[in-house]
Swiss-Prot record:
PANTHER family: 4-HYDROXYBENZOATE POLYPRENYLTRANSFERASE, MITOCHONDRIAL, PRENYLTRANSFERASES
EC number(s) recorded for this UniProt protein: 2.5.1.39
Transmembrane segments: 28-48, 52-72, 102-122, 146-166, 169-189, 219-239, 241-261, 275-295
HAMAP family per record: UbiA
Name of the featured protein: 4-hydroxybenzoate octaprenyltransferase
Cofactor(s) required, per the database record: Mg(2+)
Subcellular compartments: Cell inner membrane
């Protein structure tokens, strides 16, 4: 339903549809993968009852910053996306949106996001500057390092410490266990994503963990996912989370095991579906956290 409504813009206002595609609003998977961990942290920080204003701020912030991240990513990759099958029709490549328009749109999205952060507190505002730096630098990392997925993981996890400081005014050391857990998980699922482009990336000289890991890619992904669950288990113990949370982790572990089995032949589309499937793992963990606080 959501995607059908958005696609109707293509007929009503093709220009607006170009910007929908630029921000990937027609592909909300990135919103989910960024949203669930942010909500994990917000619910834990609020001990099951985070403030409504913070929920609104962080949900809107996730949507806006993810959109901005897509814009700056496409701007950075505008000269190479035409050589990759999956990205050759993006608006900046086709010329439907100019480089200048993309940069202005990125600035607008980040400006609105910053206005939302101003509704929190000084510590959260300062932390947001680090998140902006990570989001803006990530698209350029693939040119210089085989670890762009690590930078993405750092950026995708940055909302978690911000959620703690916004909700409590404090940042306990254990919150960084959640941060590390999400970073490891992100590197894992984004490696599946990078595996879909690996052949094209090798031709044009773009680097990724999928290339770095080589034949060990799936084993390393599963290891990263397992370490992520260990970090979450340790953090859960410190935050006194119990059975429902553990059930959420068990469901996530089942998701990871299925992805490992499903991608056994490393088919490009299967790797992409495994990437998409991680949304369910994040949701399962969030439901476990919510239920654990709700049924006490």
């Amino acid at each position: 339903m959501y995607q059908r409504l958005l696609k109707s813009l293509n007929h009503l206002n093709p220009r607006a549809w170009d910007f929908v595609q630029l921000t990937r609003m027609d592909k909300p998977i990135g919103i989910y993968l960024l949203l669930w961990p942010t909500l994990w942290a917000l619910w834990i920080a609020g001990k099951g009852s985070p403030s409504l204003i913070n929920i609104v701020i962080f949900v809107l912030g996730v949507v806006l910053t993810r959109a901005g991240g897509c814009v700056i990513n496409d701007w950075a990759d505008r000269k190479v996306d035409g050589h990759v099958k999956r990205t050759e029709q993006r608006p900046l490549v086709s010329g439907k949106i100019s480089s200048k328009e993309a940069l202005v749109f990125f600035a607008v999205l980040m400006g609105i996001s910053f206005l939302l952060v101003l509704l929190t507190n000084a510590t959260t505002i300062l932390l947001s500057l680090g998140g902006l730096a990570l989001a803006a630098s990530y698209p350029f990392m693939k040119r210089y390092t085989y670890y762009p997925q690590v930078v993405l993981g750092a950026a995708f996890s940055w909302g978690m410490p911000m959620a703690f400081t916004a909700e409590t005014g404090d940042l306990p050391a254990t919150a960084w266990l959640l941060y590390i857990a999400n970073l490891l998980w992100t590197v894992g699922y984004d490696t599946y994503y990078a595996m879909t482009d690996r052949d094209d990336d090798l031709k044009i000289g773009v680097k990724s963990t999928a290339i770095l890991f080589g034949d060990a890619d799936r084993v390393i992904i599963l290891t990263l996912q397992g370490l992520s669950l260990v970090c979450l288990l340790l953090a859960g113990a410190r935050f006194e989370l119990g059975g429902w949370f553990h059930l959420g982790l068990l469901a996530a572990a089942g998701c990871f095991a299925w992805e490992f089995w499903y991608t056994r032949d490393k088919d490009r589309m299967k790797c992409f579906k495994a990437f998409l499937h991680n949304h369910w793992a994040g949701l399962a963990i969030f439901v476990g956290i919510v239920a654990d606080y709700a049924f006490r």
